[in-house]
Amino acid sequence: MAMSLSGAVLSGMGSSFHNVGAKQSGVGTVRVGRKSELVVVAQRKKSLIYAVKSDGNILDDLNEATKKASDFVTDKTKEALADGEKTKDYIVEKTIEANETATEEAKKALDYVTEKGKEAGNKAAEFVEGKAEEAKNATKS
């Protein structure tokens, strides 16, 4: 069973304890005697938990908390990937729709230009025929 100790109890340990390592790794251990091992766990930014490891409970709790955190991050990552896949599918669908719309509009524009070109060609032909008729009549007179 793990037993919490106050900082005052640990203040006499001096150079045998380095809390910098605990801050960096999250967990640190220091051998206090031949059988006793001190476990230091970073709980929050500047808060450390000191406990004497006797039967491994502190590490079991820590491992369980780490596993829960890891599972949470894994689940959130899977959700984010699924959302990303949905977003990709939506963008592809909208791109296809935009492409189809642009193609339809281009076809309409082509049909309009073709029709107007035919009308202009017919008017030009009529104009030329009229002028040719006038020229023909002018040469007869």
UniProtKB/Swiss-Prot annotation:
Q: Which GO terms describe its molecular function?
A: galactose binding; lipid binding
UniProt subcellular location: Plastid, Chloroplast stroma
- Supply the induction statement: Strongly induced by cold. Accumulates in response to abscisic acid (ABA). Accumulates during compatible but not during incompatible interactions with the downy mildew pathogen Hyaloperonospora arabidopsidis, and thus belongs to compatible specific (CS) proteins.
What's any GO biological process attached to this entry? leaf senescence
Determine if Kinase is one of this entry's keywords.
no
Give the primary localization class. plastid
Q: Which GO terms describe its cellular component?
A: chloroplast; chloroplast envelope; chloroplast stroma; cytosol; extrinsic component of membrane
What does the record note on quaternary structure?
Forms homooligomers which interact with potential stromal substrates in the stroma of chloroplasts. Interacts with the galactose headgroup of the chloroplast lipid monogalactosyldiacylglycerol (MGDG).
Write the protein's name: Protein COLD-REGULATED 15B, chloroplastic
| Origin species | Arabidopsis thaliana (Mouse-ear cress)
